[in-house]
Amino acid sequence: MSKDILNRYLFDNADVRGQIVQLEKSYQEILSAHTYPEAIARLLGELMAATSLLTATLKFDGDISVQVQGNGPVSLAVINGNNLQQLRGVARWEGEVAKDASLQQLMGQGHMVITLTPNNGERYQGVVALEKETLAECLEQYFLQSEQLPTAIRLFANGKQAAGMLLQVLPGEDEHNEEFEHLEQLTSTIKAEELFELEATEVLHRLYHQEEVRLFDPIEVTFSCTCSRERSGQALKTVAKEELDAILAEQGKIEMGCEYCNSSYSFDSIDIEALFKNAPKADTQQ
C-alpha cells in the first residue's frame, strides 16, 4: 500500500469530520538522524502523526510546531511542519529508557506546546499539561481547552510505521452530539495493525460500513528539513567574530550541524571573513 498519506473524510449524515494519516518513509527519515531508544522512537512517531492531523484540522497556511517538554529522561520531543505536510523532528534524552516506557515515564512532569505561525497573521501558542496517560488523550484535552470541540484521537507507532486518526465535531455544531459519540465508539475499535497494513479506504469501510462517508483526495506527507548553509551562516553572524576567530585558531574550521537531519556545514576563515564583510559588529555586551 502507499505510505505517507493523509486522507480527510466527512460524514454526509453527521456534523462530524475525520482524518487518517499513515506514515512510513518520512517517519524512517526522521528516525535515521539519531539512534533512538524504542520508546522514544514510538513517541516521535505518535507526535509526527499528531502533527500531520493537527496541520490538516487547523487549516492555515504557515508553520506548525508540536513539542512535549518534561523533567523526565526525555527533556524535549518536537515535530516541526507546515501546511504542505512537510515534517521534521527530533528528541533529546539522557540515560537509559525502558522499551515499554509510558508517556509519563518518558517525560515526567511536563507540558505540550502547540505553536502556529501563519504566513499572514499573528502567531498563536497553546499549552496543555501532560496529565493524561497518552499523547492522544493530551491532544484531545488541548482541543477541548482551545477549540471547545469534542475530538477523538488515536495514535500508533512501532518504530517502523506511524499512524493516526482524528474525529471531530464540525465547528459551530452541538457539542453534545450523539452522532459524534456513536462514531467515536466505532473509531475506538481500530487496531494499530489495521492502520499499518490497510489502505485508508479499507480502514474506513471496516469502521463505518453502515455510514455514508465522503473521502477527499489524499495528501502526501514528506520529511523535509529547512536547514541550509545560508541559515547556518546567519546563525554564526549572531556570535562575536572574536569568538569565531578563536575557534578557527584552535580547530581550523567551524562545523555547524543540524540535529534534525544530521547535515553538517563547514566554515573556514575565508568563509567567516565573507560572512562578516560589511556586516554590523555583534554587540558583545550583556
UniProtKB/Swiss-Prot annotation:
Places the protein is found: Cytoplasm
One Pfam family in the UniProt entry: HSP33
Entry-linked InterPro entries: Heat_shock_Hsp33, Heat_shock_Hsp33_C, Heat_shock_Hsp33_N, Hsp33_helix_hairpin_bin_dom_sf
A cellular-component GO term for this protein: cytoplasm
MF (Gene Ontology): protein folding chaperone; unfolded protein binding
Give UniProt keywords alphabetically.
Answer: Chaperone, Cytoplasm, Disulfide bond, Redox-active center, Zinc
Q: Name one GO biological process term.
A: protein refolding
- For this chain, the annotated S-S bridges are 225-227, 258-261
Known post-translational modifications? Answer: Under oxidizing conditions two disulfide bonds are formed involving the reactive cysteines. Under reducing conditions zinc is bound to the reactive cysteines and the protein is inactive.
Q: Which domain of life is it from?
A: Bacteria
**Family that this chain belongs to:** Belongs to the HSP33 family.
Q: What does this protein do?
A: Redox regulated molecular chaperone. Protects both thermally unfolding and oxidatively damaged proteins from irreversible aggregation. Plays an important role in the bacterial defense system toward oxidative stress.
**Protein known as:** 33 kDa chaperonin
Kindly list the organism's lineage.
Bacteria, Pseudomonadati, Pseudomonadota, Gammaproteobacteria, Alteromonadales
Q: Which gene encodes it?
A: hslO
